[in-house]
Curated annotation (Swiss-Prot):
GO biological process: propionate catabolic process, 2-methylcitrate cycle
Annotated source species: Shewanella oneidensis (strain ATCC 700550 / JCM 31522 / CIP 106686 / LMG 19005 / NCIMB 14063 / MR-1)
Protein name as annotated: 2-methylisocitrate lyase
Keyword hit for Kinase: no
UniProt KW Magnesium keyword: yes
Amino acid sequence: MTQSAGLRFRQALANSKPLQIVGTTNAYFALMAEQTGFQALYLSGAGVANASYGLPDLGMTSMNDVLIDAGRITSATQLPLLVDIDTGWGGAFNIARTIKEFEKIGVAAVHMEDQVSQKRCGHRPNKAVVSTEEMVDRIKAAVDARTDPNFVIMARTDAVAVEGLEAGIERAKAYIAAGADMIFAEALTELDQYRHFKAQVKAPILANMTEFGQTQLFNKEELAQAGADMVLYPLGTFRAANQAALKVMQALMNDGHQRNVLDTMQTRADLYKYLGYHAFEDKLDQLFSQDK
């Protein structure tokens, strides 16, 4: 019997200290991540907004927008995928539908946050959070909707930056009591904060190592020692690809050719390697042999 995606995520977590989860904004990035040795993948809501729609991460994308990108990734790889579902896209029935739709396409885990529906990036100022009671209701709706008990429902709290560390911890405890499996503690700034969080919250904890944000870029050993069970790198690959693409565009505009920026590009041979291109070619040769 095929293991569910949620079970594969839980097994990856059990086998890794900590589990490194890399952001993949498209299916090809997912293939590269798999062949590099990662055991879990991530689809960022900001990544969908920025890469697929050219929009800022301000709650402007819909469930279907994210579902499309997630489905492309789960179709390309068997690695378990964690997906950012923002605030769940509505009330209890909307959240229930969200869970069912993502479960249906083979997503392993989702994280849902306690920001207000007009959300902001977790590392930007002026965030606002809903009451603990409202977030508990969101979690209960999500837990009730899943059909696979191994499908992971992770609660993200943005409250530390708004209400302080202790308030964030108390919220996390309430979220676990409501049925959340794991906690995404957003925008912590010190290793001691992770230690304190882990000591108080009896559940797996995710640390978000996003670049150019509020959190120092600790290494995985430091985070593991501080109690983090998962380390997320949500948009590093996207940012790197953007910068490389910009250099190529500038070279084309300024120099009229790309010869001086070839070293920033992936070679055709490497592209074909990650795609498994030659296996597809061999299959074509078998199906449409010239010897027929």
